[in-house]
Amino acid sequence: MKNSFIYKFTNNEPLIDNILKKYKMEEIIKNPYSLIEFINLDEIDKVITNDKSFNKLELKSNRIRAYIFECVNKTIDNNHTAVLKKEIFNYIISKTNADIEEISIANEINILVDDGIYLKKINEDFLTTKYYYEVENYILETVLFNSEIEKGVILNQAELEEYMNECEIKQGFKYDTKQRDILKYINKRKNINFLNGYAGTGKTTTAKGVLDLYSKYTDKIICAAFSGVASARIKHATGYKSITVHSLLNYDGEKFNRNEKNKLDYDFIFIDESGMTDSELFAILLNAIDFRRTEVLFA
């Protein structure tokens, strides 16, 4: 009789086999909303709502949590790592036709946050998952720490001035004050630098100047971008080898083979389109860089 319970939700035998590999039937009976990993939540909720044999009051907490998980996961699927609490309230109220009050939703959110297993509070308005909270904290700490480390200049002051003057002659126009300041700053060999600016502000020219500057120190240089098109554009504009970030990290379709135990073998890495890289990939990239030897410019 217990096994017949699951047929209330699906008669797909292969799906049922997969469900029972993960959950015991007793667990499913106790919380049928755990089936959201396999079955659409609206379908689960419809069965429970229309079946008088279910104790709706006992399942209320699990129901709310299921909708919280669904809302947060949909937000993440849309490439956002944080979700407004208010959006969760609105989502659940809309999906349940105002059958659940805000105070109950707030209570379940607070319990999940206090639990610390799934949800983390960013501030009073925003939430994220524990996973992305840890990923983005790792990024923040790594960037802040390495942005302060200097390994010593590539060229002395006189040599750098001569280098910039030579670049201006070769390219046929002068660097503006900001571009010269950037080259002076990057000459200090900080572990991490960022190059910001809108299209047409001279980022590519500055990046070319940085790459040529580093070429005086090492030939272990690589450029990478999120997309193949951007990667090809960098190669055309700078003359340096350029690949996608996935290729840089030696992605084989299942895993990234450049990682904490197998660091990238470069002295200088230029990453364009870094703003298009999601948090997870950005963290994987940082983890694969050996900052004892490597400096990175993100643009």
Predicted regions and their residues:
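Conserved ATP-binding/catalytic motifs of P-loop helicase motor domains
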Residues: 1-299
